[in-house]
Amino acid sequence: MGVPLESLAVGKCYLTEIGQIRRVLEIKEAMVKYESRGKTAHGGSWGALTTVSNLRFARDVEREVPCDYDPRSRRYPEPNR
């Protein structure tokens, strides 16, 4: 699915298809450094740092979410598709 490349920003969080939350820490020279948490990455705690191309990051996430987002919670409804 993916998000527009121009929507990526430091400090924002994004949700992947499998329920992982990724928080952008740095964008430099077309590379995105992020930390992740959620379904498959470190439970509820922010985990190890990962760096990928901005194109791959934008492709691999579904949408922007609040950084305290919990995919198991009904607190944040799914967007209309």
Where do the language-model regions lie?
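Mixed-charge, Lys/Arg-rich low-complexity intrinsically disordered regions
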Residues: 1-9
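Short, charged beta-turn/beta-strand-edge "cap" motif at the junction between a beta-strand
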Residues: 19-22
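Basic/aromatic-rich interaction segments and small domains that mediate binding to polyanionic partners
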Residues: 25-47
